[in-house]
């Protein structure tokens, strides 16, 4: 299975967490290796002095007064200067061993406005915010991946109507989720991460029991299934009608 749906969900999750933490829209997430390691993200973007001050002030709110005062003082020293903070993927010949090593955070010419200790402290503080977000996303990516793949018990439904038997099984297939539809991505993220929903495609198979032959099959995609939901909640009637019509149109053996 390709990781298009999974990567779209992970990227949206990372961007939303950045925004919720107080990072400005000019900073967003980028995958490190979407095919090999979908859950690894790095932050990319740049902030001017005013944005740095606003961000540091916001991030310092839960800190003790002394620590917050030092960080805010460093950020204020940048006010009115051409200082600019850059975040970008680390330039490496191979993939990093640790997620924290995948991103570079850089404040060019910092010596003009800050001491080495002040600069190191400020950059470590901002990196810590990004690292915390990226690690949460990495952990949540495992839950998202599990929700998109067939479980150990993939059979969801087994119904018989006369000679016809209809089977529904979780199926290793790509969904067709629009990566630009933020509202839909948010709905899936909330359903999976908060409510424990499944988002794995479902294969509908129609079998003629008398002939012992599979007559038709179709895939239901982009459907959320919540724990305890009966089949009528997630069963796509359009796909069901299509496979039944195809099965009935098949000549008898």
Indicate where each model-derived feature is located.
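Acidic interaction surfaces
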Residues: 1-253
